[in-house]
Amino acid sequence: MASFIISGSRGTDDPTMATLPFMAAKVAKEQGHDVVLWLWNEAVTLGRKGTGDHVTGVNLTPLKDLLAAVQAAGVQIWVCGACAVARQISSGDLVAGASIKGMPDYIKAVAERDRTIAF
């Protein structure tokens, strides 16, 4: 199987685009692929406990359900450290399975993966 890093940059400002990386991560994991979900820019807010509870894209599964699915599947959720600091998000604010990572971690993961998918 393949390995993916799926990145999301949109948060509550665009519910549809915010939901798509979680949907892609869920489907990729269900197909047996290795997945890292990288949240950066406004998407880091989705890594904060409770933020995704009220996000639903147009005709899409609610984000809270997709988040629960990727958490249950063991998908690593990486939250951009600089983006989190800018939004006053600390590791204690994050959902289960999420961790704060830096650009060196992201670049290393991109270099090691078969594919990168960006939303």
Question: Where are these predicted regions, by residue range?
Answer:
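A glycine-rich helix N-cap at a beta->alpha junction
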Residues: 53-81
